[in-house]
Structures are given as structure tokens and as C-alpha cells.
A protein has these predicted regions:
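N-terminal Rossmann-like NAD(P)+-binding subdomain of aldehyde/semialdehyde dehydrogenases
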Residues: 1-122, 505
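Structural signal for hydrophobic packing residues in well-ordered secondary-structure cores
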Residues: 38, 42, 57-64, 68-71, ...
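Short loop-to-beta-strand entry elements in the cores of soluble alpha/beta enzymes
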Residues: 52, 161-174, 195, 238-256, ...
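Rossmann-like NAD(P) dinucleotide-binding subdomain of oxidoreductase/dehydrogenase enzymes
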Residues: 61, 105-267, 271, 289, ...
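NAD(P)-dependent aldehyde/semialdehyde dehydrogenase
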Residues: 268, 290-400
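C-terminal core of ALDH-fold dehydrogenases
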Residues: 347-353, 386-481, 503
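Extended hydrophobic packing segments that form well-structured cores
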Residues: 484-506
Length: 506
């Protein structure tokens, strides 16, 4: 086993040893503890599980100062950003608690026994039930909202599934601190032992995916790492679902009318979006399509001017810095891509990098230019008309988001919108894609390579659906039915009865 060390990205120096990498025996023990906790957690009422989630939210909030201090030391994301992220993290738990109490996530459905044109139909009652223990992989870029206390963990616990988290190496101290806070809160609120576990190290993560009691995996990270784990999950003797959120280029299109109407405003919005969090958002607009006319050139010039004035930023880890710098060097050998602008030089210490801007044309757009690059850089792509734009978008991989900056009643936008809708899980109009709201209507997903499963979202209340499976009770006596499927439930939920939606009476 090796030491798991917390490193300060501002200096690149180790700060403390947090833990040791987790061996196979310990992974096995944690998974078996999760398996023992699974039926206990599943048997808890919705109200009881909601209380667990609220206890976690309150415990994290109570330790806000300590969490933000440690997370900032490990990520250099800044206290303002991290305070906002912790607020979001606590809000997620509260929202999932409310979703449990409301109950529609169960998709409770009753078809009473009846005569049909196909003959007699038995009494059928169906709803979603917990899948079992879930493995969650923390993300590098969100030490809170997509890590140990993040949305995958919150949605799995809400669904009634124990969780074993693989901590990310970029912020092990933050992960351990949050884990300790959460375990204590869950225990005090009445959760069974084993409901939450944590492992460290890549080998432990792989062992987690292979372990026979793990029934699903939630992952946010790189395309390369995600594909390896996806293949691992698929090659098990009993393949399990792997819900991976991977690479995303997130195209943003500025229409000719929008460029002409508000060039400076659009430029400021684009720069703010692709540099937010040092450009380390999976929803960062990595390709910006501008019309090849006077207005489009004005937007491009304003973006370049803003980039030139930007100070360097600190990235999360050495690997991200290495890949970011390599991407810039590769452009020297690519005649189709031009270096448009660069901000102030990087600091000599730590994982500092300058903000950068690249440029190409729709006709010259290459595969390399459409690959995600973490960090504060985007590629401007100029297009000469609708056909030119369509041809370029056809080269762009499917993404988590696609953005359209347009004017009202613009026919050009009407033509582009269906193209963008087909290639992303979320279509953004006259806004910027970096923010991802926690809500019932959110889709944070998309077709490969954005994710491994286009049917689900990793953000919002319906993220629970990934960790639930449908079960139908046929001709079951009332005493053996879940409360939500009984004729007279103690705690009613929205149900579809004989094909019609029936809401509880309040």
C-alpha cells in the first residue's frame, strides 16, 4: 500500500498524508458491510430516509468553515466558489429528501384485475425499488458537489442504496473530512452500519467495480478512465450498469443577428463561462461558433482582448496541467488551428497556467479541435453561413450541453436549434452552460462520449432512477404489498391507477 497525500496546487508541495491506498481485503469488507446494510436501508420508510438525508445536510452545513478551508487548500478553487458549492451540496440532500416525501419518483402503478380483449388480466401493481450497493467515483473538479457528498451519493442514498465512494486523488483530505462528517451524521440519525464507505487508490476503484455485491456505478471523470471502468463493469460475469459522465466539448453557436446586436455582452459572457473555475467544468463551452462577418469578428476581437487581460489560474492537479500545456504545444504543428490570444504568463510555482484562446474555421475544423481540454481555453470557429455551420456541427461529438445565442424570431436560430437539440442532453438559449441547476427538470447527460448512458441524468431528482429497478406484484395480498401500492396507503403517493394519474388528497 502507498500513502495518499494531500497536495497544495498553488505550490505543488505535499501538505499531509491522509490515508493509505485501500487493499483488496478492505474493499471486500466495505462492500460486504454495504450488502448487509442494503436490506435495512431499503426497508426504512421514505420519511426515515428523508431524515437521514437532512441530517447529512445539516452536519455538512455545521462544518462549513472547516470543509471550505481544507477544500481550498487542496483545490485552489477559492472560498467564494467552494462556499457556493457546499451550499449546492447541502441543497441537493434537502431536495432529495423532499422528493422522497412527495413519492412520485416511485412510479407507483396499479392495474386492477379486469376482463380485457386479450382475456382476464390479473391484479398488477408496480413500483421502483432500490437496486443495491452502489460504487461512486468522486470527480476532481468538484470536491463537494460531485464527490463524497455529491449528487451520485445523495441520489443513491435517497433511492435506498448504500454507497462506497472512491475518493479522488486531487482532494483526499476534503474527501475524508466529508466522509467522517457524513458517517457520524448517518449513524446518529439511525442509519445502519455500512451505509457509506470510502476507498483510496486506482486499484481499489477497480476492485470496487469488480466486486460482486456492487449493483451499479456512478462516475464523473475523464473519457479514458471512464471507458476503462465501463469496460470493467461490462466484462463482469454479471455485468452491471455504469453511469459515466465523461468528456464533453459543449458547442456554443452565436447567430449573425445576435453578434450584430450585442457583441461585447456576448464576448464577456463567453469568457466568463469558459474560464469559470479555471475552465475545469465539464459543461465549459469548448467550441464557440461565430459568423464570419464584421459582427462576428467584433465578438472574436472582444473575446481575444479579454483573454489577453486575464491573470493566470491554478489547475487542480499536475496531470490536468500537463494535458493543458500539451494541447497548446500541439497547435504549433496544426496549420488549421491558430493561437489567437494568451493571458498573463503562468506563475513558476504550483500548477499555474495562462488563459488561452485558439481559432479555426468551420471548413478547417479537425477532430483534435473537437476534443475536450480541461482548463481555461476555448476554440473560436468561424462559419460562413447555415450550410457551413451545419457541416461543422456534424463533426462535433455529442455533448452534455449545446448553447444557442440568438435574437427573438430569428429564422437562422430556428434552423440551428434542431441540430443542437439532437447532439446534447441540455439545450441552452441565450445563456451559458456552465451552471447546472439541481431540479426535477434538469438533464445532465447525453449520448457517448458525453456519457455512457443517454437515458439518465446525474443531476436533479430523477438521478435516483439510475439506482432503482421496477418490480411488479401480481395478485399479491394487501399485507405483502408496499404501503405505496395498497388500496388504502398510510402515506399516499401519486399513482397511475388503471391508466389514469391519481394524486393524493391533501
Amino acid at each position: 500500500m502507498a500513502d495518499v497525500v494531500s497536495i497544495d496546487p498553488r505550490t505543488g508541495t505535499p501538505v499531509e498524508t491522509v490515508a493509505a491506498t485501500t487493499g483488496d481485503a478492505e474493499v471486500d469488507a466495505l462492500c460486504r458491510a454495504a450488502a448487509q446494510a442494503a436490506p435495512v436501508l431499503a426497508a426504512m420508510s421514505r420519511a426515515e430516509r428523508a431524515a437521514l438525508l437532512r441530517a447529512v445536510a445539516q452536519a455538512l452545513e455545521a462544518e462549513r468553515a472547516a470543509i471550505v478551508t481544507v477544500a481550498d487548500r487542496e483545490t485552489a478553487l477559492g472560498e467564494t466558489r467552494l462556499n457556493g458549492e457546499l451550499t449546492r451540496t447541502c441543497f441537493q440532500f434537502e431536495q432529495f429528501a423532499a422528493a422522497l416525501e412527495e413519492g412520485s419518483y416511485l412510479e407507483a402503478t396499479i392495474d386492477h384485475a379486469a376482463d380485457t380483449p386479450m382475456g382476464p388480466r390479473p391484479d398488477l401493481r408496480r413500483m421502483l425499488v432500490p437496486l443495491g450497493p452502489v460504487a461512486v467515483f468522486g470527480a476532481s473538479n468538484f470536491p463537494l458537489a460531485f464527490s463524497v457528498p455529491g449528487g451520485d451519493t445523495a441520489s443513491a442514498l435517497a433511492a435506498g442504496c448504500p454507497v462506497v465512494v472512491k475518493a479522488h486523488s486531487s482532494h483526499p483530505a476534503t474527501s475524508k473530512l466529508c466522509y467522517d462528517i457524513m458517517v457520524r451524521a448517518l449513524r446518529e440519525a439511525g442509519a445502519p452500519d455500512g451505509v457509506l464507505g470510502i476507498v483510496y487508490g486506482q486499484q481499489a476503484g477497480a476492485a470496487l467495480v469488480r466486486h460482486p455485491v456492487i449493483r451499479a456505478v456512478g462516475f464523473t471523470g475523464s473519457l479514458r478512465g471512464g471507458r476503462f471502468l465501463f469496460d470493467l463493469a461490462s466484462s463482469r460475469p454479471d455485468p452491471i450498469p455504469f453511469y459515466g459522465e465523461l468528456g464533453s466539448i459543449n458547442p456554443l453557436v452565436v447567430t449573425p443577428a445576435a453578434a450584430a446586436a450585442r457583441a461585447q455582452e456576448i464576448a464577456e459572457g463567453i469568457v466568463g463561462s469558459f474560464t469559470l473555475g479555471a475552465g475545469q467544468f465539464c459543461t465549459k463551452p469548448g467550441l464557440v461558433f461565430l459568423p464570419d462577418d464584421a459582427a462576428g469578428k467584433q465578438v472574436g476581437e472582444a473575446i481575444a482582448a479579454a483573454v489577453a487581460e486575464r491573470q493566470p489560474v491554478v489547475l487542480l492537479n499536475a496531470a490536468i496541467q500537463r494535458d493543458y500545456l500539451a494541447r497548446w504545444e500541439q497547435t504549433a504543428d496544426d496549420p488549421a488551428v491558430r493561437r489567437r490570444a494568451e493571458g498573463a504568463p503562468a506563475d513558476s510555482a504550483g500548477w499555474s497556467v495562462p488563459v488561452r484562446l485558439l481559432e479555426t474555421s468551420a471548413e478547417e475544423l479537425t477532430v483534435a479541435a473537437t476534443e475536450e481540454c480541461f482548463g481555461p481555453v476555448t476554440v473560436l470557429v468561424t462559419y460562413r453561413g447555415l450550410d457551413d455551420l451545419r457541416a461543422a456541427l456534424a463533426k462535433v461529438p455529442d455533448s452534455l450541453t449545446a448553447t444557442l445565442i440568438a435574437e427573438d424570431d430569428e429564422e437562422f436560430a430556428d434552423e440551428v436549434a434542431p441540430v443542437l437539440r439532437a447532439m446534447a442532453g441540455r439545450l441552452v438559449y441565450n445563456g451559458y452552460p456552465t451552471g447546472v441547476a439541481v431540479s426535477w427538470a434538469m438533464t445532465h447527460g447525453g449520448v457517448w462520449p458525453a456519457t455512457t448512458n443517454a437515458l439518465h441524468t446525474s443531476v436533479g431528482m430523477t438521478a435516483m432512477r439510475r439506482f432503482l429497478k421496477p418490480v411488479t406484484w401480481q395478485n399479491a395480498p394487501q399485507r405483502l404489498l408496499p404501503d405505496e401500492l395498497r388500496d388504502h396507503p398510510e402515506h399516499p403517493v401519486p399513482r397511475r391507477v388503471n391508466g389514469r394519474l391519481v394524486l393524493p388528497e391533501h
